[in-house]
Amino acid sequence: MWDKAHGGIVHVKSQGTVNHPLFKIEWIKKKNELFTKGKVALDGNFWIVNTLETEKGILAFIHVENAEGSGIAGGAGKSRIGLGWSDDNGDTFTFLGHIIVPFNDPDPYNIQGAPYIVKNKYIYIYFHDTTGLTVARAPLAEVISAAQMGNTSPWMKYDGQERGFNSNGAGGASTRIGIDGISHTDAACSTYNNKCYLLLTRMNWKGKDTWVNLYESVDGVRWKFSKTIVQMSASQVETGYQYATIVNEDGSDNGVVGSKFFIYCNKDHQKNGRRTYKWTVDLAR
């Protein structure tokens, strides 16, 4: 998160309930205080945008801006998706390196991301390449094994129905998956109906409505619209809904839900009056 009181970009660990998710702040750390291990340089500005908890540790998906010293103050510069690994319950992380680089590596460019799902022993992550919203994947076992050793494993971008997942995650070409919106969000697969769900949002850019939409898929590649969670006109430009997450009914946030789950999303996150809203999705109805 960005916090002027703590000198800029910081990372926060909190505890709470489904009704009060930020009830208790455990700690606030800067990048060098959180990423204390590893052999890869801490290049750029880091935001942990999602985590996957496993029996062996916690895998963090990191949105990286200003990679390779690129960009100007307030700009994204070159952007990446990176990985981190924690074996102490998220109190410190090893930065493993970058796994996704946009095609042709434009500067500036915002890759957004990174919702993920686990499907058929693969991890799928979603991000914006230069073609639009797309997906890359890697075998779960390989990702975790490499992470434990302080490394990354190869990820492959989706490059169309004929070629499939056959393009290098680190700069290869990709094909958009046909839906769009801001992808600083979350995804999960349901044990109730074996479908997966992906959130996308939009703020009030150029006077358009702000919204949170839910999409569904059976394979992680072909997505269709499921429902609008909220849609409204925003009072000012650059206001509205952004940064959404999916939480299971039992309070877990690990890419798996049952028949009922909660959606949380910030509104007007750049304003003093920002708030977090909560909605319930019941797949049995």
Model segments located where?
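A short, acidic, amphipathic alpha-helical segment used as a generic capping/interface helix at domain edges
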Residues: 240, 245-251
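Conserved beta-strand position repeated once per blade in WD40 beta-propeller domains
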Residues: 48-50, 113-116, 184-186, 243-245
